[in-house]
Amino acid sequence: MRLVWFRRDLRSFDNTALTAALNSGDPVAAMYIATPEQWHQHHLAPIQADLIWRRLAELQQELAALNVPLFYQQVADFQAAAVAVSQLAKTLNATQVLANRDYELDEQQRDQLAQQLLSEQGIIWSAFDDKCVLPPGSVRTKQGEFFKVFTPFKRAWLTLFQPPVIGKNRPVALWNVPSALAELVWHPEQAFDYPRIDSTPWAADFETVRAQLRDFCRERVQDYHQARDFPAREGTSSLSPYLAIGVLSARQCVARLYHESSMGELSEGAQVWLSELIWREFYQHLVAIEPNLSKSRDFVEWGARLEWWNDNEKFQLWCEGKTGYPIVDAAMRQLNQTGWMHNRLRMIVASFLTKDLHIDWRWGERYFMSRLIDGDYAANNGGWQWCASTGCDGQPYFRIFNPVSQGEKFDPNGDFIRRWVPELRSVSSAYIHQPWTYPAVNSVLYPARLVDHKQEREVTLRLYKTAKG
């Protein structure tokens, strides 16, 4: 008997651990363990919890077609999860537990405990690199060191990369679940002891998600480099939630991208999308090799000396989308209402929080994780530290997004703003990015500016220069 432990890899197709178990020729069982207390500590978004719950029902059906039952337990935290998986493995008389690696520190420690408990029972623990196309540690400098800058990492990644070939799984022999374990089999009536927000606008079944990937790579990726920065357009893939919980693998995305390309030659848009996938790999690799990133520490040494003002009232207004800067407010309201935010907008609001309001990037990082359906620790941490200029290969500290010019450039007619900030629907495009200049501003029920961007830019330059010494 082989037991596969699912975590953030909720798919039966192109799942390294599952494929290894199926290829063993032995009966296979699967397990998912919910850890609500740990999720609270990690600020898991209720909308992502709901997507995970819905996905489990789909995964159970996919596994049933392979004659693999899905067991489910809810325990408090990662330590209890390690105990639970070792107990189930013992009960099943499993000879091996297989799982795909998570790279964050808490997750690594969970797996170390599981390995220890299983070893004491004579059960083999096998962990696989499945989250990335190229596993952490495989992309190094000529001196054998890890890359700390993205561009040379990308060049090395492309040199090592070969378009993946993805095969199909074959069912294993059917086996009957012991009656003593019947109550542990997943059924849709089960629910997490954790808040959930409806995620049904996002598909949970693999075929719909796979079709979305196919259609994007076939029909829209060619314009990705031009369309991706405009939030009013459908210019992005919207696949990030499925990468975050593992409905899709990065390999599947890259394989489909090349499959739909002409003679294996990527268009400019396809190259830019591939570059974004490599950014994702870069941040995953960093988290795997830099434990301090999992402790919410600045990547750069001088980041610890940065002075943050951390005004609670201003932070709350930022969270609610009431800063008086329309593109910032539209973005935050999109996040709060849908659980998703366009990538260009993530950079704008992160820059505004850290460099206009002088609020610690960790506050924004946690808030994003608590709201995003595509919350992924490595990507979220990497993005926030990039914007705050404290991260690995972060933007220069003197690069400070102007929320007015960003809105004018990427939402020139104000279509996105009008969608999410109804107070400004009657304001013409000439004034919508700076409503404080609107002649009839007193008739508009929209917040005044929290701060003056020009003044706060000078403050930021001073604070960062002081921290850098």
From Swiss-Prot:
<comment type="similarity">
    <text>Belongs to the DNA photolyase class-1 family.</text>
</comment>
<dbReference type="InterPro" id="IPR036155">
    <property type="entry name" value="Crypto/Photolyase_N_sf"/>
</dbReference>
<keyword id="KW-0234">DNA repair</keyword>
<dbReference type="GO" id="GO:0003677">
    <property type="term" value="F:DNA binding"/>
</dbReference>
<comment type="subunit">
    <text>Monomer.</text>
</comment>
<comment type="function">
    <text>Involved in repair of UV radiation-induced DNA damage. Catalyzes the light-dependent monomerization (300-600 nm) of cyclobutyl pyrimidine dimers (in cis-syn configuration), which are formed between adjacent bases on the same DNA strand upon exposure to ultraviolet radiation.</text>
</comment>
<protein>
    <recommendedName>
        <fullName>Deoxyribodipyrimidine photo-lyase</fullName>
        <ecNumber>4.1.99.3</ecNumber>
    </recommendedName>
</protein>
<keyword id="KW-0285">Flavoprotein</keyword>
<dbReference type="InterPro" id="IPR006050">
    <property type="entry name" value="DNA_photolyase_N"/>
</dbReference>
<keyword id="KW-0274">FAD</keyword>
<keyword id="KW-0157">Chromophore</keyword>
<dbReference type="InterPro" id="IPR002081">
    <property type="entry name" value="Cryptochrome/DNA_photolyase_1"/>
</dbReference>
<dbReference type="Pfam" id="PF00875">
    <property type="entry name" value="DNA_photolyase"/>
</dbReference>
<dbReference type="InterPro" id="IPR014729">
    <property type="entry name" value="Rossmann-like_a/b/a_fold"/>
</dbReference>
<keyword id="KW-0238">DNA-binding</keyword>
<dbReference type="Pfam" id="PF03441">
    <property type="entry name" value="FAD_binding_7"/>
</dbReference>
<feature type="binding site">
    <location>
        <position position="107"/>
    </location>
    <ligand>
        <name>(6R)-5,10-methylene-5,6,7,8-tetrahydrofolate</name>
    </ligand>
</feature>
<dbReference type="GO" id="GO:0006281">
    <property type="term" value="P:DNA repair"/>
</dbReference>
<dbReference type="InterPro" id="IPR036134">
    <property type="entry name" value="Crypto/Photolyase_FAD-like_sf"/>
</dbReference>
<keyword id="KW-0227">DNA damage</keyword>
<keyword id="KW-0456">Lyase</keyword>
<dbReference type="GO" id="GO:0003904">
    <property type="term" value="F:deoxyribodipyrimidine photo-lyase activity"/>
</dbReference>
<dbReference type="GO" id="GO:0009416">
    <property type="term" value="P:response to light stimulus"/>
</dbReference>
<dbReference type="InterPro" id="IPR018394">
    <property type="entry name" value="DNA_photolyase_1_CS_C"/>
</dbReference>
<feature type="domain" description="Photolyase/cryptochrome alpha/beta">
    <location>
        <begin position="1"/>
        <end position="133"/>
    </location>
</feature>
<dbReference type="InterPro" id="IPR005101">
    <property type="entry name" value="Cryptochr/Photolyase_FAD-bd"/>
</dbReference>
<dbReference type="GO" id="GO:0071949">
    <property type="term" value="F:FAD binding"/>
</dbReference>
